[in-house]
Amino acid sequence: LNLKGKTKEEIFKEFSYQTRQDIRTYEKYCVKTRVLNEDQLDILDEMEKETSERQDFEAMSLDFYKDLYHFYGKSHIETVLSYLDLDAYAIKMQSEFDKTSKDIEKTKAFLEQNPGNVKKEKRLKTDEEYYNSLQKKLSHIEELKQEYGKEIPLACCLFVKYGHQIVYLVGSSNYEHRVFRGPYAIQWKMIQEAIDEGYDLYNFYGIS
């Protein structure tokens, strides 16, 4: 991906419609990222092994990742984890739930005074369907908290910063929770970082 002389906004517009939607999706779900240190490379190693088994390729070893840090130096290697912040996700969904509940009450009150209003009846049906879906999401979040605690690891990637480019070298993802678009959170973070730090090229070399 050529970044030279381009802004983040210009790069975002160049993405396909589906990629832009995937980025908006992870933002909607409160997916976050954080940089891992060398002592946390076991997270990448574990997720990469799971990905390799699923996609039938040979994963690199934990020693390989550590050797990269020693060979290139810590300033040239960045390992990033994306994760679903379940508390933040729950707060956002609860806010949507409360708002939708109020909207439904307002629409019902309007229809009591103005029965037969087709537009409002359609709106009520849509809001009630959304209300039910939010109820299910909130219940599901509680189930996820019981299983995972406060966060769910979604993807983990290792990048090499060298010369005029950032190279996406190793990528892994949580297939079970792919709906949250964890890999896109990492890629968009690193593309923006590459622009901020003046790199000309973002190299999608890695395996995901």
Regions found by a protein language model. Name each.
Residues 194-206:
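Conserved GNAT acetyl-CoA-binding A-motif
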Residues 1-179:
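A conserved beta-strand-loop-helix scaffold within acyl/acetyltransferase catalytic domains
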Residues 173, 184-186, 208:
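Active/binding-pocket-proximal capping segment
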Residues 142, 206-208:
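Conserved catalytic-core subdomain
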Residues 178-192:
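Conserved acetyl-CoA-binding loop-helix of GNAT-fold acetyltransferases
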